[in-house]
Amino acid sequence: MSVKAGRTKRAAQIAGLILIGGPLVFLLSAWIGSSIPRNSDWQETADGVEIFVGTNGIHTEIVMPIATDVIDWRGRFPIGDITAAQRPYTHVAVSWGEKEFFLQTPTWGDLSPGVALNAVTGGSGVLHIAWYVRPAPSDDFRPLRITRDQYASLAAQITAQLAPEDTGQSYPGYSRNDVFYDAVGTYHLGNTCNQWTSDRLAAAGIKTGLWTPLPGGVMKWVNALPHAAALPRAPHAPDAPDR
């Protein structure tokens, strides 16, 4: 074997190790990071405001009652921005993600390499808002009861994510009950949609993981709560888009 051929072979071996080792390092780091708690002394309250943390296995979302004495979300997210505005909605779901990925990939079949690369390397954010009617608790849709002050802090955190009115706009959702709004923040591997969820919870004083790029890193902290751990998996998801 020539020197050149040997170098080529070694380069290919190194590239293969990187391709295999990179994802493994990421997954291990995500597991470790999500196992480190923030607000470790926090406990669920017996009263207060009940919210939900939901997942479809890829994304997570924070689901809240439409109106309380703390906030009426219709003042932040006009219900007239969705097609099926006349339905008797009771809850609003909020999640965050990379703008082009969300808007250009209503299904995984629509995903292009360019959109995927842009999402991984850094892209602007959008809020995904979905409206639900009496969502049922399930293994993928877990209730969490927090104090009024914690809810007020959470609401302020979410409101602050909207882009300024003079620069932001709305975009049609995937279904009749959802919509997108321009948001602040940049998406990258260190700041994913699931990290956004845990950061909002942590900022409100709620226990969650330190680095949670994957949905399991968010959900395992809710699952540890006594009144959510025993919930059965629902036979169907809430009335919401698939993503």
Put a short name on every predicted segment.
Residues 1-16, 38-47, 68-85:
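N-terminal short leaders/motifs
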Residues 53-143:
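Glycine-rich catalytic cores of cysteine/serine-nucleophile enzymes that process amide/ester linkages
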Residues 73-76, 83-87, 115-118, 148-151, ...:
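Short, surface-exposed linear patches
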